[in-house]
Amino acid sequence: MEQNEFGLVEKIVYLNRVAKVVKGGRRFSFSALVVVGDAKGAVGFGLGKAQEVPEALRKATERAKKDMVQIPLVDGTLPYEILGEFGAGCVMLKPASKGTGIIAGGAVRAVMEAVGVTDVLAKAIGTNNPHNVLRATMAGLTSLRSAEYVSQLRGMKLEAPRK
C-alpha cells in the first residue's frame, strides 16, 4: 500500500491510453482511475485525464481527495451485507469473520484496502469494467448506515447485540 505525506492510501485502479486519430497520425491521451482512503473508514475515487500519465494521476488523486466519504466499519469489516449497483455492474459485499482477509478482485479490492476493511467477501457481477465496478462498490458502501444512525432515525435506544 502506497501512503502519501498525509497518511492517505493511494491506489491506482486503472490506467488507460486512448488514441485520437488526426491528419498527422495518432494523438495519445491517458486516463487514470484512482482510489484514496485513510484506512480508517474514509474513501474517495477520482478520474483524471491528461496528455501525460503523471498529470492524469495527479488530477485523479486530487478529485479522489475532494470527494471522500466516511464509511461505518465494525471490527475491520462491514456492518452487514450490501449490494451496490451502477450501470450493468453489480457488486455484492459480505462481512467476514476475523482472519478471512479481503476476498475480492480488481477495483473492489483497491477500495476495500483504501477504506481500511481487513475482512470481506466480494463478488462483482454483470461487468468487469473497472469504472462501473468501482462506482457500484462505492454506491454500496455509501448506502451503509451505522447502528447508531438507524436507532436515532427510529427514535429507539441502541441495545447490545444478542449472543
Curated annotation (Swiss-Prot):
Which terms does the UniProt entry file under GO BP? translation
GO cellular component assignments: small ribosomal subunit
* Residue intervals of the S5 DRBM domain: 8-71
Q: What does UniProt give as the signal peptide span?
A: none
Keyword list (alphabetical) reads: Ribonucleoprotein, Ribosomal protein, RNA-binding, rRNA-binding
- A Pfam family of this chain: Ribosomal_S5_C
Q: Which GO terms describe its molecular function?
A: rRNA binding; structural constituent of ribosome
Self-association state and partner proteins as the record states:
Part of the 30S ribosomal subunit. Contacts proteins S4 and S8.
**Domain comment quoted from the record:** The N-terminal domain interacts with the head of the 30S subunit; the C-terminal domain interacts with the body and contacts protein S4. The interaction surface between S4 and S5 is involved in control of translational fidelity.
Question: Per its UniProt record, what PANTHER family does this chain match?
Answer: MITOCHONDRIAL RIBOSOMAL PROTEIN S5
Main function: With S4 and S12 plays an important role in translational accuracy.
Describe the family membership recorded for this protein in Swiss-Prot or TrEMBL.
Answer: Belongs to the universal ribosomal protein uS5 family.
Query: What name does UniProt use for this protein?
Result: Small ribosomal subunit protein uS5
In its UniProt entry, the species of origin is given as: Nitratidesulfovibrio vulgaris (strain DSM 19637 / Miyazaki F)
